[in-house]
């Protein structure tokens, strides 16, 4: 069995890496891959523990990074969704020669809420952790529903997510647990000023996991970064508003 991560590479143009979120896999990008492959050489990865990389595992952001480094293109645009945004930001901070531009999608440097920081309530994350040990298939489905909640096309969004995710092998429970732990514990806020490359932050106005207040707070920390808010989207704007999403990436890449 391969010890390498599963990478899917297609298209022509500048290198662009797509990283999925917790409980998902690279198939979630399929809708936008069809549009973006005309403009970029795309590198879609299944992170350790997910999809075709389900037999692998990584317990921290740096362990994930080390596995990515084995086949990642240098000087690429990195696009990370949700937990994938934490991974992409970690790559940009610690392996900057691989990242020419950074794009985070519905992501936060700290997902768990605390006193003056908006985010996912810690009890929600601990409930997911408990449910995971009982029935991880249902837990992942619940998380999909939570991601789409609020979007006018929520039902269709969930259907698209399910179709994509269940088209590949199921994630391994150990990696799901490690991912939840990262969402609960990682805090990159103090490291963000060290980012040197251009950055674009994309958000869904209706997102219940990464509240729009996070976008405003990060504007102060990252004054040189750009941001865009998708008005009709919740946590998965590339599924709800794929054309607008691709437009944002193309515009940012061309700068």
Swiss-Prot record:
It comes from Vibrio vulnificus (strain CMCP6). Its main location: cytoplasm. The active site is at residues 82, 207, 235. Keywords: Biotin biosynthesis, Cytoplasm, Hydrolase, Serine esterase. It is found in: Cytoplasm. This is Pimeloyl-[acyl-carrier protein] methyl ester esterase. PANTHER family: AB HYDROLASE SUPERFAMILY PROTEIN YCLE, MONOACYLGLYCEROL LIPASE. NCBIfam families: bioH.
